[in-house]
């Protein structure tokens, strides 16, 4: 959530920043401006009524001695003022709720360093690493490679759960497990604390990280009360672990990692992406989360992105890193890097990780603060990133390491976890 004071102190700055994401957001800014204006007018009216009530209440005692009739009139007026105040105070509460609900639907403001743009066409490539493999044959997509090896079974998955689910078996299941262990071990060596969080969270937890209320249709909701949801990313429980707390600056940065199943309805139409492991309703992902002070978060974003890139370097996969433009960033993000892995069957890079600095946006929603060295209480900055999407990493390995005879070489870094060097 943005700081509501910005709408009073720097309204033009807010408009300019949010319009760089999407000009349609100016409608919500206008609603907040009008609600704030109405709120202030009502508040002034209530304060004036309260002062008048207090003045009359003080005079009643004196008037009772001197002029009982006037005292009676004053008491009637006090009663009328109380009734009017009560009505207006109720109106104030309703306006506060409207302001809060509207603010929850306004995204974070992009950092000034972010390129202004409309969509992914305006994203900026930052760097590339690794060489795409060359083949003496036409490479198959991972779906075909996995099915021929008998390690991916989408037909059975469809019988069990419907479309856009995957069933991994044998070496496919073992490769998935090896990837998760490899990633978690790699991140643990860099100071991240491994966590096994719940995969079901309460509604307010999703409000904290920004999935709700805006993206409710993308979430799998459980029936009954209290309202609970399956997590779409481990960012949700990891970032909320310290909600409502005041941390000491010496404790920062907090660095957390988890490998969890993730659940997303993915209601849109994605063409070829509905085939294979690229865009499923359930998938495994290793997540990175950092809780930072307000000064170091952008340096930590660079470090987190490097940590995610290091996973791909270790696997020998070619990738590129792009900085997202204002129009392509996620709801809670102030700055985002996407890491894209090379997919030979498509002859292009595909997203495998997204690393974001959410500044104080999520912290305000979950009331997560810290006491700085001077003793001042501030909101923390929160960062999150995929370290990385496991299914997409598995897909990239099947495609990049496939051999002409249909076998797949296991990347060296995975062999201690997997136990052999080839899948055939």
Curated annotation (Swiss-Prot):
Which sites bind L-serine? 233-235, 287, 386
Reactions listed under catalytic activity: tRNA(Ser) + L-serine + ATP = L-seryl-tRNA(Ser) + AMP + diphosphate + H(+); tRNA(Sec) + L-serine + ATP = L-seryl-tRNA(Sec) + AMP + diphosphate + H(+)
Predominantly, its location class is cytoplasm
Q: Which CDD domains match?
A: SerRS_core
Where does it reside?
Cytoplasm
Query: Could you tell me which PROSITE patterns the record lists for this protein?
Result: AA_TRNA_LIGASE_II (PS50862)
Lineage, top-rank taxon, reads Bacteria
Looking up InterPro entries in the UniProt record yields:
aa-tRNA-synt_IIb, aa-tRNA-synth_II, aa-tRNA-synth_II/BPL/LPL, Ser-tRNA-ligase_type_1, Ser-tRNA-synth_1_N, SerRS_1_N_sf, SerRS_core, tRNA-bd_arm
Keyword line? Aminoacyl-tRNA synthetase, ATP-binding, Cytoplasm, Ligase, Nucleotide-binding, Protein biosynthesis
EC number(s) for this protein? 6.1.1.11
A single GO CC term for this protein reads: cytoplasm
Q: Name one GO biological process term.
A: selenocysteine biosynthetic process
Q: In which pathway does it act?
A: Aminoacyl-tRNA biosynthesis; selenocysteinyl-tRNA(Sec) biosynthesis; L-seryl-tRNA(Sec) from L-serine and tRNA(Sec): step 1/1
UniProt comment concerning the protein's domains: Consists of two distinct domains, a catalytic core and a N-terminal extension that is involved in tRNA binding.
Give the protein's biological function.
Catalyzes the attachment of serine to tRNA(Ser). Is also able to aminoacylate tRNA(Sec) with serine, to form the misacylated tRNA L-seryl-tRNA(Sec), which will be further converted into selenocysteinyl-tRNA(Sec).
Family per UniProt? Belongs to the class-II aminoacyl-tRNA synthetase family. Type-1 seryl-tRNA synthetase subfamily.
Task: Report quaternary structure and partners.
Answer: Homodimer. The tRNA molecule binds across the dimer.
Q: Which NCBIfam families match?
A: serS
Full protein name = Serine--tRNA ligase
Question: What is the originating organism of this protein?
Answer: Elusimicrobium minutum (strain Pei191)
- Quote the gene name from the UniProt entry: serS
């Amino acid at each position: 959530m943005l700081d509501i004071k910005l709408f009073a102190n720097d309204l033009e700055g807010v408009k300019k920043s949010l319009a760089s994401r999407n000009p349609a957001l100016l409608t919500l800014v206008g609603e907040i401006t009008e609600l704030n204006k109405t709120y202030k007018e009502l508040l002034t009216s209530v304060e004036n009524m309260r002062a008048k009530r207090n003045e009359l209440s003080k005079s009643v005692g004196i008037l009772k001695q001197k002029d009982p009739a006037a005292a009676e009139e004053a008491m009637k007026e006090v009663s009328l003022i109380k009734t009017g105040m009560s009505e207006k105070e109720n109106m104030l509460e309703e306006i506060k709720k409207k302001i809060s609900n509207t603010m929850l639907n306004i995204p974070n403001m992009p950092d000034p360093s972010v390129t202004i743009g409309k969509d992914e066409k305006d994203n900026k490539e930052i760097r590339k690493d690794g060489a795409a493999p060359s083949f003496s044959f036409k490479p198959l997509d991972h779906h075909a490679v996995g099915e021929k090896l008998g390690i991916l079974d989408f037909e059975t998955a469809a019988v069990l759960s419907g479309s856009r689910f995957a069933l991994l078996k044998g070496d496919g299941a073992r490769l998935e497990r090896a990837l998760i262990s490899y990633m978690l071990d790699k991140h643990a060596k860099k100071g991240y604390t491994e966590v096994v969080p719940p995969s079901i969270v309460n509604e307010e937890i999703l409000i904290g990280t920004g999935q709700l209320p805006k993206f409710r249709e993308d979430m799998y909701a459980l029936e009954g009360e209290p309202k609970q949801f399956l997590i779409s990313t481990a960012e949700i429980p990891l970032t909320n672990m310290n909600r409502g707390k005041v941390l000491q600056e010496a404790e920062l940065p907090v660095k957390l990692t988890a490998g969890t199943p993730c659940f997303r309805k993915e209601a849109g139409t994605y063409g070829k992406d509905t085939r294979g492991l690229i865009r499923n309703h359930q998938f495994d992902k290793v997540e990175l989360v950092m809780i930072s002070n307000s000064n170091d978060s952008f340096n930590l974003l660079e470090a987190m992105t490097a940590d995610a890139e290091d996973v791909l370097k270790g696997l020998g996969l070619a990738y590129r890193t792009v900085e997202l433009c204002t129009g392509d960033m996620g709801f809670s993000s102030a700055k985002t890097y996407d890491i894209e892995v090379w997919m030979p069957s498509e002859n292009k890079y595909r997203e495998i990780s997204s690393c974001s600095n959410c500044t104080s946006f999520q912290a305000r929603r979950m009331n997560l603060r810290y006491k700085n060295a001077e003793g001042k209480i501030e909101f923390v900055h929160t960062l999150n990133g995929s370290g990385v999407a496991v299914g997409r990493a598995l897909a990239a390995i099947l495609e990049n390491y496939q051999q002409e005879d249909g076998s797949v070489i296991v990347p060296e870094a995975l062999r201690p976890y997997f136990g052999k060097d080839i899948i055939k």
